[in-house]
Regions:
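Nucleotide-activated chemistry modules centered on ATP-dependent adenylation/adenylyltransferase
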Residues: 1-257
Length: 257
């Protein structure tokens, strides 16, 4: 249980789960603790994410602190171009350099982090706690058994329109063309956002095979997005929501293996 001097820090990722987790943290601790809600601006998210953030500020009754990277212009493509890779076994550099680095500079010792893990993600929380017994985290959605669909419904019941990406059928409000997506997801991005899809193709042309995200299931060879064949289009493909904290949790898990 956090002491009264502890800061409770919620990371708002412009997704429904982090919105509800933040609202619940305010309900649980807003009267007794310093609850901070932070967001990392990313230029590659849909512009409607900013509308959603403003609506949630009204719902929360307080402003959200927006952190913004300046080294890469908060742009994932700039990260990939300058770091010369798109993803490796430790994850994607965009989330590390555009989100985690900002949080590292902002956080204070003793902060308690609010994880937006949903009830479907109990195993991720268990793994994190097992491997980080000295790190204080709160998971209000799991504590209340709330799943992803519950969170969306709660946001709508609060009179807030879900982010445009959800309304198109996507599973989250990550960047348009999130590099954690699979083939079906990228077929959907190719249809809905051809310009952003072409930007990633162009990057892969520049960086070469090391930047390719997908493998041929038969030959096991990597192939570029430009060579993505026809097949199922999956807007609702499950992709982890991109947040500072989930990324920290996953990175810590990989580092300890
Ligand atoms: S949403 Fe995807 S592409 Fe955007 S920063 Fe996170 S991991 Fe990178």
């Amino acid at each position: 249980m956090p002491t009264e001097s502890t800061r409770i820090v919620c990371q708002f990722s412009c997704g429904a789960a982090s919105a509800v987790a933040s609202r619940l943290a305010l309900a649980d601790y807003g009267g007794t603790h310093d609850v901070q809600i932070i967001n990392a601006f990313i230029a590659n998210e849909h512009e409607d994410n900013r509308r959603f953030l403003a609506d949630c500020e009204t719902w929360f009754g307080r402003p959200i602190t927006v952190l913004r990277d300046t080294k890469y212009g908060a742009d994932i493509n700039e990260v990939f171009r300058r770091e010369r890779y798109v993803k490796n076994q430790f994850g994607a550099p965009c989330t590390k350099l555009l989100k985690r680095r900002l949080l590292d500079a902002w956080k204070q010792p003793g902060d308690v982090m609010v994880f937006g893990y949903t009830a479907e993600e109990q195993d991720r929380l268990d793994t994190f706690r097992e491997r980080n017994p000295d790190r204080a985290v709160i998971a209000p959605l799991i504590d209340r058994g709330l799943g992803k669909e519950d969170c969306k419904a709660m946001v709508e019941r609060a009179g807030i329109k879900l982010p445009f990406m959800y309304r198109l059928g996507y599973d989250n409000a990550n960047c348009i063309g999130c590099v954690k997506g699979g083939e079906g997801y990228f077929r959907a991005i190719r249809e809905d956002f051809p310009e952003q899809f072409e930007s990633l193709c162009h990057l892969q042309d520049l960086l070469g095979p090391g930047s390719y995200l997908h493998r041929n299931r038969i030959t096991n060879e990597r192939f570029s997005l430009r060579n993505l064949g026809d097949g199922p289009v999956r807007r609702n493909e499950k992709i982890p929501t991109c947040s500072f904290f989930c990324e920290i949790a996953e990175a810590d898990i990989v580092a300890s293996m």
